[in-house]
């Protein structure tokens, strides 16, 4: 789960502003505070260092559980992964042992976009299962894209009978499956804002207010897609003979 400190610059995607936070304190305490703070940041005529930092009243934004919105598995396609040719230049049939090797990449790429300016600089994990049964777990950052691939290979030996003055192609083949996963990750905000008053309010100069009281909303969404391609059911196929 990703976690980082909230800043005043985050307030816009929470449908809030320093003015609206200040007004929330005014409505609650009947007096407008001189300044407000969140974590180590201050606004207006706030006490420094920030009282939220001094007294340990921190405010965080956190990523929640990944929600898989949709999964689309495309029609499988045949893929030739490698080939080898057996040749017979003689005048009678011959049985040859042919080695064939195949290589391919299982690839995964992803991209993310933030709803209404949601920001999250730290990486967070997105995990789940593809329809093919494979598990995925990628580290993503809001508004960025990336990719990874794993190279795989296979070798096989097979006996092939080749007619006179002919050639036979042996292919290593597989079934390519591609899938697109669309996901959403909720971003929630929790913690406190602080306010300092020029004169005592209910016996105190400093007051703190939770995010659900100070902000218009306390959540946002990061959306993204994961594209995955992999090869299944690898086997060898012997093609028809052809004249040399």
UniProtKB/Swiss-Prot annotation:
SUPFAM superfamilies referenced in this protein's UniProt entry, alphabetically: Aerolisin/ETX pore-forming domain
Transmembrane as UniProt keyword: no
Keyword terms, alphabetized: Secreted, Toxin
Keyword Transcription attributed: no
Location of this chain's protein in the cell: Secreted
Main location: secreted
GO molecular function: toxin activity
One Gene Ontology CC term in the entry: extracellular region
Family the entry assigns: Belongs to the hydralysin family.
Protein name in UniProt: Hydralysin
Protein species of origin: Hydra vulgaris (Hydra)
Source taxonomy: Eukaryota, Metazoa, Cnidaria, Hydrozoa, Hydroidolina
Gene name in the database record: Hln
């Amino acid at each position: 789960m990703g976690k980082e400190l909230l800043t005043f610059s985050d307030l816009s995607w929470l449908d809030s502003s320093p003015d609206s936070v200040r007004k929330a304190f005014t409505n609650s305490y009947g007096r407008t505070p001189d300044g407000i703070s969140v974590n180590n940041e201050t606004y207006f005529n706030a006490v420094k260092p920030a009282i939220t930092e001094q007294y340990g009243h921190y405010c965080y934004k956190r990523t929640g559980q990944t929600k898989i919105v949709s999964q689309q598995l495309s029609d499988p396609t045949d893929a030739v992964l490698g080939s080898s040719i057996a040749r017979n230049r003689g005048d009678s049939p011959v049985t040859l042992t042919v080695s064939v090797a195949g290589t391919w990449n299982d690839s995964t790429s992803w991209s993310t976009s933030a709803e209404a300016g949601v920001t999250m600089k730290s990486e967070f994990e997105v995990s789940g299962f593809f329809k093919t049964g494979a598990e995925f777990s990628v580290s993503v950052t809001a508004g960025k894209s990336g990719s990874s691939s794993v190279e795989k290979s296979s070798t096989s030996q097979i006996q092939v009978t080749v007619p006179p003055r002919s050639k036979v192609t042996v292919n290593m083949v597989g079934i390519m499956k591609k899938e697109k996963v669309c996901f959403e990750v909720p971003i929630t905000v929790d913690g406190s804002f602080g306010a300092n008053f020029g004169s005592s309010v209910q016996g105190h100069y400093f007051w703190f207010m939770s995010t659900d009281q100070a902000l218009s909303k306390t959540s946002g969404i990061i959306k993204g897609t994961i594209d995955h391609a992999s090869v299944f059911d690898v086997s060898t196929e012997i093609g028809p003979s052809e004249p040399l």
